């Protein structure tokens, strides 16, 4: 159970990988009982009869069996979803990172199509003219790893900490060791920086200029503008300016691509184009206003777009989910989720974030594994016991949190800890669950099983290093703030 699920009126813990089937079962009921919005289907060139043929196999009996949910609950939620306006169906990472994630996400999006929830307030919007930056797929990462293994990469520049945030099952860390020269732009000696031959620290965020473009669709063209609030404390340089300086030194086409004296000049030139595209003429006045408001929050009418369902009557059919690990040897599904405090680990060096209690378990200053009470009882595990979590890829030891908000056939470990370095507050604290993730293979393509790795859990001892806020034994004590 996530913080979102805990805030919900109803929690429906479907079996991992069955969420797409659940969506199609709801879609079948909505179509069969004519609860859809006719105008919305017509706007997308769809006919209910054609869609119903595609989802007819997803009857309540089958969906209940595959998801582990009751038929009555599925039907009740489907009818309530169709009769409530606005209603929104969203697929999170737990769905997208399954082996059948793409089709499951499309199945969930189809629910929004049926109730006319595209291009309207409270629904789904495409980006309204926001610039599209470069994207990198898993295939791109695997191709890079292949090149590094083949000694085709002579120098690598890193803005981030992939040594910590990329699952070792991909072979990334091993391949990186074959690159002769590594450059890191981290402001801390993180797991990647300690491997680097050269570290060029970036400004801190509060020392930096920049722009922020939301990934989610909005009706307005939203571009947030970052501006420094303090002067740089140390002899650092902002990452884009280092690249611009290097481009100037290289000359030729590289120098011509960045004809700016500074990153701020480049940022102003980019914003000037956007202001002109929106009909503005006085850029200096507009720039001052942008600094005051923090960005651009208006859509150019010529940039507005609408979503349309592109699949026609072809209903997405999620395949059976693939899981790494034999079910008999590894009976539990592993869920790895971003920490509310550290996200993927980038906030781990900050002691006030380490001190921030997890909103669901109240745990602080470490890692833990969440286990359902029924499962814990079967395994002889008590709250705070040190346990070993083993997958086909590896194992780690963490204390157990007995948590009713998780399915009995699952365990969950938050991301964020397990750093080799990154300062005194992060170094050697907790464990990195990414080391448990194995690879699944469908056809010729292998990918990390982000939410598709099976594990087993065994009790090691009664004493685990688990600290929680408000622990009945008083194990939580603040050395940072005393009131």
Regions found by a protein language model. Give the residues of each.
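A glycine-rich phosphate-binding loop feature that marks nucleotide/adenosyl-phosphate handling sites
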Residues: 44-45, 94, 99, 125-132, ...
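Conserved active-site and cofactor/substrate-binding residues in soluble primary-metabolism enzymes
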Residues: 17, 21, 46, 58, ...
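Flexible, glycine/charged-enriched surface loops at secondary-structure junctions
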Residues: 36-41, 88, 119-125, 254-266
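A cross-kingdom feature strongest in bacterial/archaeal respiratory oxidoreductases
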Residues: 1-7, 11, 15, 130, ...
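A glycine-rich, hydrophobic/aromatic-adjacent loop/helix-cap motif
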Residues: 81-150, 215, 302-312
């Amino acid at each position: 159970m996530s913080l979102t699920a805990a805030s919900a009126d109803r929690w429906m813990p479907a079996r991992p990988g069955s969420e797409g089937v659940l969506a199609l079962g709801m879609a079948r009921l909505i179509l069969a009982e004519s609860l859809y919005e006719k105008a919305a289907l017509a706007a997308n060139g769809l006919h209910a009869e054609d869609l119903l043929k595609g989802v007819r196999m997803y009857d309540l009996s089958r969906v209940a069996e595959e998801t582990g949910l009751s038929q009555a609950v599925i039907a009740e939620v489907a009818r309530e979803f169709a009769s409530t306006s606005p209603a929104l169906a969203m697929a999170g990472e737990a769905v997208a990172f399954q082996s059948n994630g793409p089709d499951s996400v499309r199945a969930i999006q189809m629910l929004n199509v049926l109730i006319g929830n595209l291009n309207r307030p409270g629904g789904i919007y495409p980006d309204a003219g926001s610039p599209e930056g470069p994207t990198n797929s898993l295939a791109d990462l695997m191709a890079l790893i292949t090149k590094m293994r083949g000694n085709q990469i002579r120098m690598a520049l890193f803005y981030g900490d992939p040594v910590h945030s990329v699952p070792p099952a991909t072979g990334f860390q091993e391949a990186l060791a074959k690159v002769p020269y590594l450059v890191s732009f981290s402001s801390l000696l993180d797991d990647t920086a300690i491997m680097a031959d050269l570290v060029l620290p970036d400004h801190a965020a509060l020392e930096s200029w920049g722009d922020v473009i939301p990934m989610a669709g909005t009706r307005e063209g939203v571009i947030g503008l970052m501006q420094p609030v303090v002067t740089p404390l140390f002899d650092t340089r902002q990452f884009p300016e280092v690249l611009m300086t290097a481009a100037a030194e290289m000359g030729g086409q590289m120098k011509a691509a960045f004809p700016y004296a500074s990153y701020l000049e480049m940022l102003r030139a980019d914003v000037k184009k956007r202001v002109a595209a929106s009909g503005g003429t006085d850029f200096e006045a507009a720039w001052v206003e942008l600094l005051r408001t923090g960005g651009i929050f208006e859509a150019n009418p010529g940039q507005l777009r609408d979503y349309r369902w592109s699949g026609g009557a072809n209903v997405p059919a999620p395949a059976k989910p693939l899981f790494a690990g034999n079910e008999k040897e590894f009976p539990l599904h592993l869920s790895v989720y971003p920490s509310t405090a550290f996200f993927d680990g980038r906030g781990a060096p900050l002691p006030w974030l380490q001190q921030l209690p997890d909103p669901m378990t109240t745990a602080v200053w470490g890692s833990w594994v969440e286990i359902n009470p029924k499962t814990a009882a079967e395994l002889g595990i008590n709250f705070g016991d040190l346990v070993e979590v083993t997958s086909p890829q590896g194992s780690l030891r963490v204390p157990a949190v007995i948590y009713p908000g998780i399915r009995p056939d699952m365990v969950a470990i938050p991301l964020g800890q397990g750093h080799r370095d990154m300062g005194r507050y992060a170094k050697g604290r907790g464990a990195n669950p990414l080391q448990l993730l194995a690879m699944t293979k469908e056809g010729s393509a292998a990918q990390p099983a982000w939410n598709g790795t099976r594990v087993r859990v065994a009790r090691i001892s009664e004493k685990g290093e688990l600290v929680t806020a408000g622990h009945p034994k008083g194990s939580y004590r603040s050395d940072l703030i005393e009131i």
